[in-house]
């Protein structure tokens, strides 16, 4: 597996990557020969050679089908896993190469910092006239919050992710130029050990993960990766500011984290009041345990003796106070440590943390008290020649406490608007509640939302579940503090009545503070094209409502709105979704400003382009002026979490990129573009006609039958990827009821990737026919929004394969002749206009590194896809009863996901 097509050319900086891929590819070959047989390796090589030849000659997939069809399920599974293992090592090599390139930039000492990093952002800001004073005034307004979700798009189980980390560590160690030959041999042995253990581990769990499993999975990234790199992020920022401006102001907290795991009830009956309480408790235990361990290490480090160095009087006073507060813990102090006040104070701080965990006397009442203790130690060290005797390590812990508090990550709660509406209708005994217009419902809800009247309690299941949720939130606020709770998100929000409903239910559930207000940030989520269009009217109605405005005043006159990238794309296609999101932000900002409210956005992005994925820096550059304003809250879903935060060095890079992008977009937003006034109608036309084409396709008679036959959606629904069902419970198989994640996942597996491009060509053609070709070319050149949109579509197109998609389509029988020509024609139209407007002869011509990465993978994905089609046809012939075929199909899904590096 170490030969390459001659046409694959690596740029000079990427030659080490080429060498790694060759070396690791050879290692995969050795693994296959050892674990299966030499004959099996020979067979893999024959298939691989055929796949490469087929790509080079643009031959049909039938050349592969002859070698692959009709295999026994176990043989097919082994073959798929062989190619998947190749993807695994290539993905690892590419991640390690990113670390290598980062180190090369840092070592170079040149005036050109790594693009999109903090040094790059600050140099660009200074070049644009930003002074240190202006930067210092802005820093307290910066608030970057990645929010981790448990959507079922992570197709790799944790046991394999952990082994992947071992492989990464061995390769990173090998980057050290001082390694001896024996050490390099040891590095290779460690890599092979982890790779072999991975081969002997099943790709997926036989049971669906619980909410607790998902919580543990996300907690791994928070406690094992981000906990480690957060202080380094601030140190990097300090270094960048000092290098750019000569001095460093005191840095506020810029980063925090959120999570939906345990709080996302939308469509998931496994999430309720118990998981909310359990998640908050588990996160509290996890982060306090980390603090205790770190304080233990600090106690050993801070062994300064009063016979040799002084400590501050304030620290000695605190030590005596803690001895009185925690007499049992003080009595356990070792006499030989009596002259080590830092060590003694650290021991008592650990005892306070244990009391906090146990809800016992002497507990910290808030993270700020622990911060004060750490600051006391820092001040004493600084005043007594201790800057190089532990100050650095103590400050790292202080940054962690500021970032993670006692809660680790803020927990959001989400539920669909219809669930709230049904509960209120039952409580009020109004069977026609849904039939009443929003204005009438808002008027009825007003007295309950403001507390003038009590919403009646009823004992049905829906009301009982919601009452328990709000009671759990009230208890959590008391026990864990307000910082532990994020937002309450209303999915499928349509009007102000949906928001007032939550306010009324929260009051009934007891979520009321001492001032009589509901201490909850309620966030409407606009996620269909129509709701995005109507979002401005909804927010205007909401902010004009006296009851809600009173609530908002108690929340600092700041309103958050969540924008749904996934469902809007499924609803109207990617062009309408992107443009609807762009317009909605502009209009919502204007409406909120007119009413004296600060509006912030929560971006519900997924991993794939169809669901809003892509580089954060480019997304913020393309965002409307003023839409960032120091704040970035964005979901991190599924495989994105692993890709961005699975390795510490890359997690640090991701945090730097987000923070740098927010600084640039906030302090020096893009200059106003007068031409946008005439570009917008052109984009309106593109979006409108794109939607017409997209909906004509997905709303055609028998389309859902075609979708279910021409994609492996039935396999995906049988996989144990997450705790949430793929379809809203109790609803039929209509497209509107299918979750956006499996929708995108299925089309990606079938290599048609419909959600990422369908309709775009028709929209662009309509604009050209209307005489706007020059405007489109101008937009592609000078409008970051449109350029980013086209680049994203180009990337999706480059990952698709029409020939493979046709194999899947033929599984639909007679429906193939009706639907596949539409796909083929729209694809040709889209690809033609995207290349023309980007002025490229081939897709991704401007991004040769990404193009090379995709070309490296495609010949290895093709055999898996061809096998997948054959296995799918045979499995369906058994009515989905053959478990051996299903296991092989699951291996195919995992293999294609590894190759494409995205799922849903």
UniProtKB/Swiss-Prot annotation:
This is Phosphoenolpyruvate carboxylase. InterPro entries: PEP_COase, PEP_COase_bac/pln-type, PEP_COase_Lys_AS, PEPCASE_His_AS, Pyrv/PenolPyrv_kinase-like_dom. Its EC number is 4.1.1.31. It catalyses: oxaloacetate + phosphate = phosphoenolpyruvate + hydrogencarbonate. PROSITE patterns: PEPCASE_1, PEPCASE_2. It holds the Pfam family PEPcase. One of its GO terms (biological process) is tricarboxylic acid cycle. Forms oxaloacetate, a four-carbon dicarboxylic acid source for the tricarboxylic acid cycle. Its cofactor is Mg(2+). Belongs to the PEPCase type 1 family. The active site is at residues 151, 570. GO terms for molecular function: magnesium ion binding; phosphoenolpyruvate carboxylase activity. Keywords: Carbon dioxide fixation, Lyase, Magnesium. One of its GO terms (cellular component) is cytosol. The gene is ppc. Residues 52-71 are annotated as: Disordered.
């Amino acid at each position: 597996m170490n030969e390459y097509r001659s046409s694959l050319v690596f740029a000079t900086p990427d030659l080490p990557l080429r060498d790694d891929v060759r070396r690791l590819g050879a290692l995969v070959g050795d693994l296959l020969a050892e674990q299966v047989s030499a004959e099996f390796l020979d067979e893999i090589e024959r298939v691989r050679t055929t796949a490469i030849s087929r790509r080079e000659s643009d031959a049909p997939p039938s050349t592969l089908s002859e070698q692959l069809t009709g295999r026994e399920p176990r043989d097919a599974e082994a073959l798929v896993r062989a190619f998947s293992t190749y993807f695994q090592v290539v993905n690892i090599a590419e991640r390690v190469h990113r670390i290598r390139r980062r180190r090369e930039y840092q070592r170079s000492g040149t005036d050109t910092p790594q693009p999109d990093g903090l040094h790059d952002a600050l140099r660009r800001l200074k070049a644009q006239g930003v002074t240190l004073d202006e930067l210092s005034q802005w820093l307290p307004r910066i608030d970057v919050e990645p929010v981790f979700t448990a959507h079922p798009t992570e197709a790799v189980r944790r046991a394999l992710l952990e082994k992947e980390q071992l492989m990464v560590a061995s390769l990173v160690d090998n980057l050290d130029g001082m390694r001896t030959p024996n050490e390099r041999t040891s590095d290779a042995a460690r890599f092979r050990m982890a790779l072999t253990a991975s081969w002997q581990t099943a790709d997926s769990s036989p049971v669906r993960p619980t909410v607790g499993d998902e919580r543990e999975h996300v907690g791994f990234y928070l406690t094992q990766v981000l906990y480690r790199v957060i202080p380094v992020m601030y140190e990097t920022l300090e270094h960048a500011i000092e290098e750019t401006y000569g001095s460093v102001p005191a840095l506020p907290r810029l980063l925090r984290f959120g999570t939906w795991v345990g709080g996302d009830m939308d469509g998931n009956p496994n999430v309720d009041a118990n998981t909310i309480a359990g998640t908050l408790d588990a996160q509290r235990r996890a982060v306090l345990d980390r603090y205790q361990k770190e304080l233990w290490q600090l106690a050993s480090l801070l062994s300064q003796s009063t016979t040799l160095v002084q400590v501050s009087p304030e620290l000695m006073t605190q030590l005596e106070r803690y001895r009185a507060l925690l007499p049992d813990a003080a009595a356990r102090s070792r006499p030989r440590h009596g002259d080590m006040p830092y060590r003694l104070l650290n021991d008592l701080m650990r005892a306070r943390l244990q009391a906090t965990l146990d809800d016992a006397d002497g507990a910290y009442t808030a993270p700020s008290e622990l911060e004060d203790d750490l600051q006391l130690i820092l001040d004493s060290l600084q005043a007594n020649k201790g800057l190089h005797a532990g100050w650095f390590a103590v400050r790292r812990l202080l940054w962690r406490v500021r970032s993670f508090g006692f809660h680790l990550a803020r927990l959001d709660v989400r539920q669909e608007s219809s669930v709230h509406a049904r509960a209120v209708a039952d409580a009020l005994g109004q069977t026609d509640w849904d039939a009443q217009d929003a204005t009438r419902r808002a008027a009825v809800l007003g007295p309950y939302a403001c507390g003038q009247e009590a919403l009646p309690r009823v004992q049905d299941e829906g009301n009982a579940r919601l009452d328990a949720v709000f009671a759990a939130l009230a208890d959590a606020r008391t026990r864990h503090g307000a910082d532990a709770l994020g937002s309450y998100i209303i999915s499928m929000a349509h009007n102000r009545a949906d928001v007032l409903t939550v306010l009324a239910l929260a009051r009934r559930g007891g979520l009321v503070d001492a001032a009589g207000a509901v201490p909850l940030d309620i966030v409407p989520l606009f996620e269909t094209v129509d709701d995005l269009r109507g979002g401005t009217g909804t927010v205007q109605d909401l902010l004009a409502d006296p009851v809600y405005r009173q609530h908002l005043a108690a929340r600092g006159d700041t309103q958050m709105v969540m924008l749904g990238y996934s469902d809007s794309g499924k609803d109207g296609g990617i062009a309408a979704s992107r443009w609807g999101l762009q317009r909605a932000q502009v209009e919502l900002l204007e409406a909120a400003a007119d009413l004296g409210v600060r509006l912030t956005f929560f971006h519900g992005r997924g991993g794939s382009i169809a669901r809003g994925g892509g580089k954060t820096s480019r997304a913020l550059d393309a965002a409307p002026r003023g839409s960032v304003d120091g704040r970035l809250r964005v979901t991190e879903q599924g495989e994105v979490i692993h890709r961005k935060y699975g390795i510490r060095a890359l997690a640090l890079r991701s945090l730097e990129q987000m923070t740098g992008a927010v600084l640039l977009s906030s302090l020096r937003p893009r200059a106003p573009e007068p031409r946008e006034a005439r570009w917008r109608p052109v984009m309106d036309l593109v979006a409108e006609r794109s939607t017409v084409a997209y909906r004509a396709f997905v709303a055609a008679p028998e389309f859902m039958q075609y979708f279910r036959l021409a994609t492996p959606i039935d396999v995906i629904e049988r996989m144990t990827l997450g705790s949430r069902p793929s379809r809203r419970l109790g609803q039929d198989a209509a497209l509107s009821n299918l979750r956006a994640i499996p929708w995108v996942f299925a089309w990606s597996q079938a290599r048609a990737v419909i959600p990422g491009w369908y309709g775009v060509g028709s929209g662009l053609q309509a604009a050209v026919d209307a005489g706007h070709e020059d405007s489109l070319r101008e937009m592609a050149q000078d409008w970051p929004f449109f350029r980013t949109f086209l680049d994203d579509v180009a990337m999706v197109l480059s990952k698709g394969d029409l020939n493979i998609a046709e194999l899947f389509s033929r599984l639909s029988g007679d429906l193939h002749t009706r639907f596949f020509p539409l796909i083929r024609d729209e694809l040709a139209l889209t690809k033609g206009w995207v290349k023309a407007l980007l002025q490229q002869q081939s897709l991704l011509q401007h991004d040769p590194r990404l193009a090379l990465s995709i070309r490296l993978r495609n010949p290895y994905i093709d055999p898996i896809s061809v096998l997948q089609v054959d296995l799918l046809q045979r499995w369906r012939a058994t009515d989905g009863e053959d478990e051996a075929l299903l296991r092989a199909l699951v291996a195919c899904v995992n293999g294609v996901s590894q190759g494409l590096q995205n799922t849903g």
